UniProtKB/Swiss-Prot annotation:
It comes from Bacillus subtilis (strain 168). The gene is fhuD. Residues 1-23 form the signal peptide. It is a lipid-anchor. It is found in: Cell membrane; Membrane raft. Keywords: Cell membrane, Ion transport, Iron, Iron transport, Lipoprotein, Membrane, Palmitate, Signal, Transport. This is Iron(3+)-hydroxamate-binding protein FhuD.
Length: 315
C-alpha cells in the first residue's frame, strides 16, 4: 500500500511540475517581451539618425511620432505605445485597443516599461533620441521628407510588409477614382480652400501639410485659388499665414475650415464681417473639419478624410 501511495505521490508531483512549466511558458508568451526578438533576424536601416540595426519583423513598436501611428496599424504591425494625440483622432476609433497612452510622447520612462523592440520618433525629438537608443533600436523620421504615399512605402520596406502596402494602395486608388467622379460632377472647376485659425492667425494650406490637402489638390485634382497656389503650393512649407484682411483673396468657392485644435480660440475670425461676407459662407459651402483628424496623413486618417470631403462636396 505504501508503495502505491509513493507512486501516486510521484505522479501527482509530476503533474504539478508540468502545470507550473506550462504556466511559465504561457506567461512569457503573453508578455511578449522584446527579449523574444533579441535573437530575431535584423538588418541595417538607413535612418535620419544614422544606420540603425532593427528587427526584420518587429513585434513591439512604440510610435512616439504620433503622425505615424496609422501607417504601422495599416501594415499590421503591433504597436504597444503611442502619444495621447493618437487617442483623440476620431478616425482611429476602435483601432487603439491594447495600445498604451504614453502622454505627450516625451516620457522615456513610459517607453522603458513597454519593453519595445523598435521605437519611431521625429527628428525634432533631439536629445531624447540618444536616451531612447539605449532602450531599443530607434528610427528618427523627418516629417516633410516624403509625401504620405511614399512614407507608407518606406515604412513597409522597413518592416517587410510591402504586400500590405500595395494592397492598401490598390484599394485607395479605387476609392479616389470613385470619389473623383462624384465630386467633379458636383463642383466642376470651382475652387477649394483649406483654412485653420490659431487665435487671430489664419493659415491657408496647400497639398503637402496634412489637413486633407493631398487628397483635395493631388488625388482629386481640385482647383486651389490663384493665391493659394502661389503662396502655399508652388512655394513655402505647404502653408501660408495671412491676415484677416487678406482672407477674401485666398477664399475659394468651397472652404474646409476649423480651429488649430479642438476647442481652440478662433480669434473671432469666424464671427467677423469679412468672414461672413465670403461667397462660400453665404452659399453654405463651408465645412468644419476635425482639427485632429485632419492633422494626420496616414492611410486610416486619409480614408476618413476622403469620406468627409466627398460627403461635404456632394450633398
Amino acid at each position: 500500500m505504501t508503495h502505491i501511495y509513493k507512486k501516486l505521490g510521484a505522479a501527482f508531483f509530476a503533474l504539478l511540475l508540468i502545470a507550473a512549466l506550462a504556466a511559465c511558458g504561457n506567461n512569457s508568451e503573453s508578455k511578449g517581451s522584446a527579449s523574444d526578438s533579441k535573437g530575431a533576424e535584423t538588418f541595417t536601416y538607413k535612418a535620419e539618425n544614422g544606420n540603425v540595426k532593427i528587427p526584420k519583423h518587429p513585434k513591439r513598436v512604440v510610435v512616439m511620432a504620433d503622425g505615424y501611428y496609422g501607417y504601422f496599424k495599416t501594415l499590421g504591425i503591433n504597436v504597444v505605445g503611442a502619444p495621447e494625440n493618437v487617442f483623440k483622432n476620431p478616425y482611429y476609433k476602435g483601432k487603439t485597443n491594447g495600445v498604451e497612452n504614453i502622454g505627450d510622447g516625451t516620457s522615456v520612462e513610459k517607453v522603458i516599461d513597454l519593453n519595445p523592440d523598435l521605437i519611431i520618433v521625429w527628428t525634432t525629438q533631439g536629445a531624447d533620441i540618444k536616451k531612447l537608443e539605449k532602450i531599443a533600436p530607434t528610427v528618427a523620421v523627418k516629417y516633410d521628407k516624403l509625401d504620405n504615399i511614399e512614407q507608407l512605402k518606406e515604412f513597409a520596406k522597413m518592416t517587410g510588409t510591402e504586400d500590405k502596402a500595395e494592397k492598401w494602395l490598390a484599394k485607395w486608388d479605387k476609392k479616389v477614382a470613385a470619389a473623383k467622379t462624384k465630386i467633379k460632377k458636383a463642383v466642376g472647376d470651382k475652387t477649394i480652400s483649406i483654412m485653420q485659425t490659431n487665435g487671430k492667425d489664419i493659415y491657408v494650406f496647400g497639398k503637402d501639410f496634412g489637413r486633407g490637402g493631398s487628397i483635395i489638390y493631388k488625388d482629386l485634382g481640385l482647383q486651389a485659388t490663384k493665391l493659394t497656389k502661389e503662396k502655399a503650393i508652388d512655394q513655402g512649407p505647404g502653408y501660408t499665414s495671412i491676415s484677416l484682411e487678406k482672407l477674401p483673396d485666398f477664399a475659394g468657392d468651397y472652404i474646409f475650415a476649423g480651429p488649430w485644435q479642438s476647442g481652440g480660440d478662433d480669434g473671432g475670425v469666424f464671427e467677423s464681417s469679412i468672414w461672413k461676407n465670403l461667397n462660400a459662407v453665404k452659399n453654405g459651402h463651408v465645412y468644419k473639419m476635425d482639427p485632429i483628424g485632419f492633422y494626420f496623413t496616414d492611410p486610416i486618417s486619409l480614408e476618413g478624410q476622403l469620406e468627409f470631403i466627398t460627403e461635404s462636396l456632394t450633398k
